[in-house]
Amino acid sequence: MKVTKVGGISHKKYTSEGRLVKSESEENRTDERLSALLNMRLDMYIKNPSSTETKENQKRIGKLKKFFSNKMVYLKDNTLSLKNGKKENIDREYSETDILESDVRDKKNFAVLKKIYLNENVNSEELEVFRNDIKKKLNKINSLKYSFEKNKANYQKINENNIEKVEGKSKRNIIYDYYRESAKRDAYVSNVKEAFDKLYKEEDIAKLVLEIENLTKLEKYKIREFYHEIIGRKNDKENFAKIIYEEIQNVNNMKELIEKVPDMSELKKSQVFYKYYLDKEELNDKNIKYAFCHFVEIEMSQLLKNYVYKRLSNISNDKIKRIFEYQNLKKLIENKLLNKLDTYVRNCGKYNYYLQDGEIATSDFIARNRQNEAFLRNIIGVSSVAYFSLRNILETENENDITGRMRGKTVKNNKGEEKYVSGEVDKIYNENKKNEVKENLKMFYSYDFNMDNKNEIEDFFANIDEAISSIRHGIVHFNLELEGKDIFAFKNIAPSEISKKMFQNEINEKKLKLKIFRQLNSANVFRYLEKYKILNYLKRTRFEFVNKNIPFVPSFTKLYSRIDDLKNSLGIYWKTPKTNDDNKTKEIIDAQIYLLKNIYYGEFLNYFMSNNGNFFEISKEIIELNKNDKRNLKTGFYKLQKFEDIQEKIPKEYLANIQSLYMINAGNQDEEEKDTYIDFIQKIFLKGFMTYLANNGRLSLIYIGSDEETNTSLAEKKQEFDKFLKKYEQNNNIKIPYEINEFLREIKLGNILKYTERLNMFYLILKLLNHKELTNLKGSLEKYQSANKEEAFSDQLELINLLNLDNNRVTEDFELEADEIGKFLDFNGNKVKDNKELKKFDTNKIYFDGENIIKHRAFYNIKKYGMLNLLEKIADKAGYKISIEELKKYSNKKNEIEKNHKMQENLHRKYARPRKDEKFTDEDYESYKQAIENIEEYTHLKNKVEFNELNLLQGLLLRILHRLVGYTSIWERDLRFRLKGEFPENQYIEEIFNFENKKNVKYKGGQIVEKYIKFYKELHQNDEVKINKYSSANIKVLKQEKKDLYIRNYIAHFNYIPHAEISLLEVLENLRKLLSYDRKLKNAVMKSVVDILKEYGFVATFKIGADKKIGIQTLESEKIVHLKNLKKKKLMTDRNSEELCKLVKIMFEYKMEEKKSEN
């Protein structure tokens, strides 16, 4: 679904349904705005000023454009009339020479436009020249009105003999309904093949391909003509069509018509049957065949349209040959039509669940369900990351799904004997892993766990398990009853004592104030701002965590980065922090950003976005500045003119309108035009913010850093404050020094979250997520809020904001051993095993300072969220190791990097903003090239040495696995809908998908896959071949190879980790096969992987062989283009190193070596 506008009316466009639906917010204004479509502005007939060469003509045509933008032709009672727009008429001098024939897009309109311009009377007959354009608009309006009235899908729920079922009511659906049962599938396919053979001979298709190969852009009509000859359309002349139509009036069935008109082509027979007889004759296996030529030809025409008539430049002749090879073409069309039949059956099942008797599936109804499903699938990453983190904390070797297995339980065997089965928590104690698990828990929850209290620990792990399972069973296992807003309800889960203490401590007022104090210290505020100024800032600032979900509000960091460039044009007073020491300058900027950011997101947005703010005053000022720019005054044309007529009176609605315009036009405009929207909004907020600071006496923050010399009392306190904060983390009972308390007393907080059990469980989940997943979750919840216009997830978003105060901070006291780092180090051909070897290896003190291991953030993340052993195996296979030489090179390059950054910065300024008499020379070009090459080399080396590349690899792998889990959820949903659609009378289908087997009547054992296999065997009990597909021997092989239904379990239960029994490429192959019932879904798998790779800076091409095996054709780094508009050879650097590209390629190919059988 996407939002669009047609003639100024907001719609939701459902591309799969092909219809436009009124947006709810527009319902009351639709008729009025539809009528407004008939008002046609005449400036559309005047050429753009920029299309002329001379400045005089640009200015003259600009004035014409402006004049005619206020003149409209409208239709009333079938008569055309002229009227003025809303703008006031301005007295002006005019002359016949002001408007020339060359200024008008179409010469036939020139005479009447000239009369209008010269203020001469124009009658309705003269206005008839615009009739055709008005007619086109009228057709558009009628189409829209029909769309609104037809605002429904062709499905209705009925009750037939006490069996609730859904049927399609369109003509196509009548055909599909005839073949609803899978037993008729073979006959359906046979009819498709037969129709294809009737329409197309192999030699004709071969000739068609030759014609396409020799095609030029201007000769596409020849392909159409040749194709029409193939299907016999040229023989159906107009008089022949009249003969057929006359006969149809007197003939009641297709057979009789063919007898009377025997010369009809196969296609014409099919089209006539579909149009005139399909819903009149009683369908049987014989007459229904008539419909299939029509179906096949539609698919063929669509292929020609996509690959020939509207052929894209990236479609090669080889691809055309493959697609249109006779047997391939036949199979492709067969699959497409089979997919459509399957989709119909699934839709019948879907609407059976959601509709009441007699109810029709409307487009709005469909959209709501799609939106809910899409939102829930976006949350899959939450459950999968949390699940991986749980496994990592437990250090479990269990390859099976561990949810529901925290506690041990007593079970009975076949003989009735009781046996205790250990839970995952039991294993911590049985395998003596208490210390390791305690350290792992501390990395996530920063809490001092008492591992000697086993019951308390078991309750805590059970809480985490229940919270994860609650989400997984709602999403991964597709819960029909679950609404998006209830995904984090965590019903019937009581927080354990540890959970309560931990969460209550997190939302404690004193702890929150200390977090803010830590941020002030980290941002170097105490070093660069005098004490009395800090205290004054704190007195005037309120720190809030409430989420401000406002569309199109620019981030503060984006605005800050543009202040220097925009300060003159916007009339802003600004002093950029600058010292002789680059590090010091950066620290001052960090402090300034932190202090200003709190004001921006707090009191400023509260004021600016309110009805009492000056939002509209500032926005008008920005438009006026653009309008009065010297260059625009000459032409009379200015970019921001398009925003002048926006009528919304509330800032939030104004922004939503601009965001809508941006999204609608994004695909049809060049980058410069798209940037206009973002640039306009950024200027409004930047000007508004700086005005707010000036009006509220807070501009003094501009001068931060200038009083450093007088701030001796706090300048050197950073480390002292850090030490205290670390001690306080370990013991909250220690006394807070007066010096810190003085600041804490002045920190004011907004409303603090109140404790609820639901938020307590949500908190446990959040602490298991990495920073990226937490950001994605926040975005998903904000989008849900916006789409549903409700306050759902407000508390959850506030909690995320609260945790973001320090969620991505590295805990310094996490355990890190030399042999863990040593897995990726090359010490004379071996891995480093202990501190002694690490000291010898690392003479540059990058990993070891002589006494202690230096802890890099990336390795902290790898240990906390990662797959250390799997990463080691992938790195070993890729030959990826850090050498002593690389450490030395890194240390040397580190000393030179500031010089290279400075060189790039200065030369880029010279290129982008040259001073008077300054020119970017060839020598500058070469120096810039050398600087960016040095920076690239250093950056890649740094990312390797500091383990950033391994951390990226882990994040990439995890992201791909999350996405694949989403596909298994869709498969489960589709299976459920297909079975319900095909067998609406079967009352036991729901038991296949019910997890509480003890409540089931028929399917009492096993998970979804096992229960479905039982159903499958019952369905095909008389077909030995199909039953044998899931024999015990075959199931054993399928499980081992993770094929067929068992790839679903392998992905959904996250069994790829830790051992990678099959490669990621094989996972993709097997998943595509599982999804082969839907071509779009199957093809989407690889597209989503390519998109994820692109997000991480890789450009990949996969190849799929005739045997359906997937391989990597190319995998390269994304290129970063520098000095884009310079008329020289493009300067490009690689975002990722070649070594990392190789590592990613190996990641896709890696799988655990098979154990050799012992003989």
Swiss-Prot record:
Gene responsible for this protein: cas13a
Cofactor: a divalent metal cation
Region annotation Binds crRNA spacer and target RNA: where it falls in the sequence: 804-810
Keyword Hydrolase found: yes
The protein, known as: CRISPR-associated endoribonuclease Cas13a
Keyword Repeat: yes
Region span, NTD: 1-170
Site (Binds crRNA spacer): 601, 771, 901
Cofactor note: Pre-crRNA processing is metal independent, while crRNA-guided target RNA cleavage is dependent on divalent metal (i.e. inhibited by EDTA).
UniProt GO molecular function: endonuclease activity; RNA binding
Region Binds crRNA repeat and spacer, residue ranges: 1-11
Outcome when changing residue 1087 to A: Wild-type pre-crRNA cleavage
Coiled coil segments of this chain: 880-946
Effect ascribed to mutating residue 299 to A: Wild-type pre-crRNA cleavage
